[in-house]
Structure formats: structure tokens, C-alpha cells
């Protein structure tokens, strides 16, 4: 239902020599009991002489307010009451009081010629006025609308839907969203959850398909998006007003690395009712070698080491390779790489050929060997020494699907690796247009940590900068959140076409980036209630306050209470649970009997192969794989790697 503005004026524009009306700002007075407040949208109807003045309509948003009386100085009021406040309240004649408001211009119709705001009556804006003031009519009431509901503008009993333009939110005209606010009170995660549900329901069909990849970096924040939350009547009314059907996300896919034991998942979503929906995230040498820059200390790796790593990536990995000493190798895992290194060192020692192999000095080779050999130890559970990988479904992304990667309990090095590889793979597939969807929203919280304004340029920071500057052309959209916007890299927040602010810290509002806001607007930002946001969008010439309904998904802390995480299982039980996820017909006792007496390393390899191939008969394949090396080559005799002897000239 479209609600029209009240034809009864609530105020009138005034212009004096000290406070004139300009093309971008005007002042108006109202009665003292008005419903107008900071953030209210008003409409001015020109009533002067001439067609341009009488037909001109101006929309504005209130940015400040003042109250006046006829007092020239406070001393007069004190003397009039004889210094007694009680007598002032009993005076027979009340002093005249005026409410004066300052408003910033949102839009003028016609837009040319641009002139000062005319003197005229001021009205409260209705639904159609809000749409016109925010220029939403250009993408809302068209043959192919691109409007995405972001919330409700509320003022004086009016609830008017506010929409964002999908072309400026998800590209190609502009893209990216950034949301700032204090932790816990700004509802940043809730706002992103609601906006994703709005995008999934209202993203125009002619723009193609869309999915979301969310990195869970804090506790259980994003671990229950497939579970329904609790809504009250006010939330349901807001959903209906915005044209959104409340409910949890229908296609949610969860991924998490293993813990150090290699069988228990490193996530809080381990309750028996939900654990089957979490897929392992495990990578090997092939997956991580291209991201050696993330894993290795750049102060410790020089150009020679970089050149040798590139040689391994281009000439050795996944190829039949002759080490020059009569040995044939096919390197696909860290264990294979260790065997190659051992062959090189033994060959050089036996052949007495000095300290150069394929133009690379032995000290450089030892250095790279030591650094790469530590990767699987430092990222244990995420990176495997020997075994197949378990990855996201590249090329098979679902339309309106949400892919949650839980790295909340992963060490910082592992988090950096996950961010770098996942986003890089997204970009590669979007460039080739074979991801399965046309656009992807990447949600990253804690930008203060991953893209700080100061400090060294890490791989993750450079990756986020690349998304914010060039991602919109590919359909790769960054939704970022942080507590302190002033401490995030300027190019990351500056390239966000849509900027959202929740409740802000007063110290943050005192930084130079907020000087464009009026003092009254800053005060409102510092005291915003939960569920209210200030939104800046390319179509909005001024920030607008909106209220959004509570997300219709289970909040993280409520989800942990309803679905308490299970304790880590013993090795055999954890293996059984992994197989039950693949085939509910499997019984844990069968698995225990099958793996009894086998080495845990062999069981992990066999389990990884079963997860990768997902056969019809899970137990039969596990039985076949046990005791057989899982990989691309036949089983070899297992030999322990002897420690390298010290070398006098070894500088590392």
C-alpha cells in the first residue's frame, strides 16, 4: 500500500540574511509538538511568483534542529522568575517558542536550473515522496526493476521502504558494501544476513544468478544460517512491508578444516543433528604451492628462494620429473616433495658434484625445503602431508547458495591461506565464467585485522584491495565489516559504493572522516538503537536512516544453546561419523572392526580417498584402500626420512 504525504503543511521555509536558503540547504520552522526529528525527510512545495518557483518541488532530510524564545539573554528569564524556577512555571503567560530545523537538499524537481530552495510550505514525505527524494523511481518503477530492499524509513508513524540499486550494489556500475559500528550494538552481522536474504529474493532475473561466500571468523556467528530464528509481530510487519518472505537460507553449505587429529572438524557446528552438513576443508601441496607468499615469511625468503619455488611449481609439481640422478618422480603431495629433496641431497653428495643443482644452490634448496616442510605442521588439519584434498565445489556453485567457511578456530596463518586461496579461485572461475553463478558476494568481517590502514602490505590485504578496485567487473563483490572505519585501508572503504553505519563510538566519530556529518547526526549515530542503520548509496545525495527487521535465521549464540557442540570423539568414532555422513547405512561398530589394527596415518589416507570419490559402497572402498597408499602412484615401501647432517657453510 502506497502511503501519500499529508497535504496539511507542518512548517514553512524561512530565509534570513544570516541563515539564507541555498541550493543545498534550507531552514524551516514547525510547531513545538511536531513529529519531525533528525533524519526526517520533508517536501517543500514552492509557492512564490513565477512558474519555476511555484512549480518547484524540493526534498530534504533534516540534519539539525534549534529551539528559540524571545529572550535576548538568559539573565532576563532569571530576573523574571526572581531566581526561583518554581515561579517561572507559574507565570500566567508562557514565553513564545519556535522550533527551527536545518535540512540538506536531497533532490530538486526540476533539477535544472539549480536554484536556492524557494520559500514555501513544508510537508511530511510519503512513500512516493521518499522514492522520489532518494531517486529510487529510476530503478524501482521500470520495465526491469533492479531494486533491493534495505530497510524501512520510519518517521512520525510512516514506514516507507528504502531500496538499493542492484547495479550499484553488485555491479557493474558500482559495487561493494562496507558496514561499520561498535561490536555487539551495531548489528553488523545481522544487517548482512538480512541484506543477503533480500538480495536472494529480489535480485533481478535478467541479471543472472548470485551466491554468497561467508568467512566465519568469530565464534558461532554464521554457523546456523539454515535454522529459523524467532521473529516478533513488528519484524513480520516489516518483512511484509518490504516484500520479503522471512525464513532461513535454503541452500547453505558449511566447510571447516580438521583439528590436529585429522578426523574431528575444527568448528562449533558439531552437534549430532547438524554435523553431517559440514564438509571438511583439506588442501595439499598442489592447492597451496601457488600461495607460498602467504605461508612464508617475506623477510626470510629472498629472490633466489622465490625462483626455486617457481621452478617447483612450473616444472616439477604434477609432472613426470627426472632428478638428474636416475630417479623418476611425480610430485603431488608434501611427502612426494620430501622424497625429491632427499634424492637431490643424496645425489649431490654421492656424485660429488658440488653444491649446485639445476642452477639452484643447495643452500637455497635446503632453505625452501625447511620452510615448505613446516607448512603442514603449522596448518595441521587444513594442510595434509599425503592424501587427497577436499575443497569447495568449484564450477558447481548453486544459485542463491551460501557457502560458509568456518575459520574462527584456525590459527592466523591458516586463516590467511584460506582467504587468499578461496578468493583467488573465485576470481579465476569468474574470469572464465565457469563458477556456476554470475556474481558472488564475499563477506569478510574484522577488516580492521585483515585490511588495516597501517602496517605491511600482506597478501590478504592486497587481495582485498584488488577485489574492491576491480572485482565489480567480474561480479566479485566484497561485503566488509569492521568496528573502526577510520582504521581500515582507505581504498577498501573508499571503493565501497554502499556504506552502512550502525551505532558508532564517539571517539571514532571525532576522526576526520566524519566531519561531513552534522553534530546532531553524529549524536544520533552514537545513540542508534539496535536494528537501525544509516545508509549512504550512490543514488542518495545524503545519508538516510533506516530500520531493518531481525534476520529470520538463528543467531550464533542462540544456536550454540539449542545445538550444543559435541565433544571431540575418539579416533575410531570420529572416522565412523565421517563415513556415516557419506552413507547413513554405515554403522560405527562396522567401521571400528574394519580399521582395528591399522595405523592412523593409513586410515586418514583411506578416509580422504573415500570422501573424495564418494562411492556407492563406502565400507567396501575403505576396506580396499586400507593398507594401500592413497595417491596417483602405486604403493611404495614406507621409509622414514633421515635427518639431514649439519653443513658448515649452511647459513639457515
What feature does the model see in each segment?
Residues 204-210, 214-215, 219-225, 247-466, ...:
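P-loop NTPase motor domains
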Amino acid at each position: 500500500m502506497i502511503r501519500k504525504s499529508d497535504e496539511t503543511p507542518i512548517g514553512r521555509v524561512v530565509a534570513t540574511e544570516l541563515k539564507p536558503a541555498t541550493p543545498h540547504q534550507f531552514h524551516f520552522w514547525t510547531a513545538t509538538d511536531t513529529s519531525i526529528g533528525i533524519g526526517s525527510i520533508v517536501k517543500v512545495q514552492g509557492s512564490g511568483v513565477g512558474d519555476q518557483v511555484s512549480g518547484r518541488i524540493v526534498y530534504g532530510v533534516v540534519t539539525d534542529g534549534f529551539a528559540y524564545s524571545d529572550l535576548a539573554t538568559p539573565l532576563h528569564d532569571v530576573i523574571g522568575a526572581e531566581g526561583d524556577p518554581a515561579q517561572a512555571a507559574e507565570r500566567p503567560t508562557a514565553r513564545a517558542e519556535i522550533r527551527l530545523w536545518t535540512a540538506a537538499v536531497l533532490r530538486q524537481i526540476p533539477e535544472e536550473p539549480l536554484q536556492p530552495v524557494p520559500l514555501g510550505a513544508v510537508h511530511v514525505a510519503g512513500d512516493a515522496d521518499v522514492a522520489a527524494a532518494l531517486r529510487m523511481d529510476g530503478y524501482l518503477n521500470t520495465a526491469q526493476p533492479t531494486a533491493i530492499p534495505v530497510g524501512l524509513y520510519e518517521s512520525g508513524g510512516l514506514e516507507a521502504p528504502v531500496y538499493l540499486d542492484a547495479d550499484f550494489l553488485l555491479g557493474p556500475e558500482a559495487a561493494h558494501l562496507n558496514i561499520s559500528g561498535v561490536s555487539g550494538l551495531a548489528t553488523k552481522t545481522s544487517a548482512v544476513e538480512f541484506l543477503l536474504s533480500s538480495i536472494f529474493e529480489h535480485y533481478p532475473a535478467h541479471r543472472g544468478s548470485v551466491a554468497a561466500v561467508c568467512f566465519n571468523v568469530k565464534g558461532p556467528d554464521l554457523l546456523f544460517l539454515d535454522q529459523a530464528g524467532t521473529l516478533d509481530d513488528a519484524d513480520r510487519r516489516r518483512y511484509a512491508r518490504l516484500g520479503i518472505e522471512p525464513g532461513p537460507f535454503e541452500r547453505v553449505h558449511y566447510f571447516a578444516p580438521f583439528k590436529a587429529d585429522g578426523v574431528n572438524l575444527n568448528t562449533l557446528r558439531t552437534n549430532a543433528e547438524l554435523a553431517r552438513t559440514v564438509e571438511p576443508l583439506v588442501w595439499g601441496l598442489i592447492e597451496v604451492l601457488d600461495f607460498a607468499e602467504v605461508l612464508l615469511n617475506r623477510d626470510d625468503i629472498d629472490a633466489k628462494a622465490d625462483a626455486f619455488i617457481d621452478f617447483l611449481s612450473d616444472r616439477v609439481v604434477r609432472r613426470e620429473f627426472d632428478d638428474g640422478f636416475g630417479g623418476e618422480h611425480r610430485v603431488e603431495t608434501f611427502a612426494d616433495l620430501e622424497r625429491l629433496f632427499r634424492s637431490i641431497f643424496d645425489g649431490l653428495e654421492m656424485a660429488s658434484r658440488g653444491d649446485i643443482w639445476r642452477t639452484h644452490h643447495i643452500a637455497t634448496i635446503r632453505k625452501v625445503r625447511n620452510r615448505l616442510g613446516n607448512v603442514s605442521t603449522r596448518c595441521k588439519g587444513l594442510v595434509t602431508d599425503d592424501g587427497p584434498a577436499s575443497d569447495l565445489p568449484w564450477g558447481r556453485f548453486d544459485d542463491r547458495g551460501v557457502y560458509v567457511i568456518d575459520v574462527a578456530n584456525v590459527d592466523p596463518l591458516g586463516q590467511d591461506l584460506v582467504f587468499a586461496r578461496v578468493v583467488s579461485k573465485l576470481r579465476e572461475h569468474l574470469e572464465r565464467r565457469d563458477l556456476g553463478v554470475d556474481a558472488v558476494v564475499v563477506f569478510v568481517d574484522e577488516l580492521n585485522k585483515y585490511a588495516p590502514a597501517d602496517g605491511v602490505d600482506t597478501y590478504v590485504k592486497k587481495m582485498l584491495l584488488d577485489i574492491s578496485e576491480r572485482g565489480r567487473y567480474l561480479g566479485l563483490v566484497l561485503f566488509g565489516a569492521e568496528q573502526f572505519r577510520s582504521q581500515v585501508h582507505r581504498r577498501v572503504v573508499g571503493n565501497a559504493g554502499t556504506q552502512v553505519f550502525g551505532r558508532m563510538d564517539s571517539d571514532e566519530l571525532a576522526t576526520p572522516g566524519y566531519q561531513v556529518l552534522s553534530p546532531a547526526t553524529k549524536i544520533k549515530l552514537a545513540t542508534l538503537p539496535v536494528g537501525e542503520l544509516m545508509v549512504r548509496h550512490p543514488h542518495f545525495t545524503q545519508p538516510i536512516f533506516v530500520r531493518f527487521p531481525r534476520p529470520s535465521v538463528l543467531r550464533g549464540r542462540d544456536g550454540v544453546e539449542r545445538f550444543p557442540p559435541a565433544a571431540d570423539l575418539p579416533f575410531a568414532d570420529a572416522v565412523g561419523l565421517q563415513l556415516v555422513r557419506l552413507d547413513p547405512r554405515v554403522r560405527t561398530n562396522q567401521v571400528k572392526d574394519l580399521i582395528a589394527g591399522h595405523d592412523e596415518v593409513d586410515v586418514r589416507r583411506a578416509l580422504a580417498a573415500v570422501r573424495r570419490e564418494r562411492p556407492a559402497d563406502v565400507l567396501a572402498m575403505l576396506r580396499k584402500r586400507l593398507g594401500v597408499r592413497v595417491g596417483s602412484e602405486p604403493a611404495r615401501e614406507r621409509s622414514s626420512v633421515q635427518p639431514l647432517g649439519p653443513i658448515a657453510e649452511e647459513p639457515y
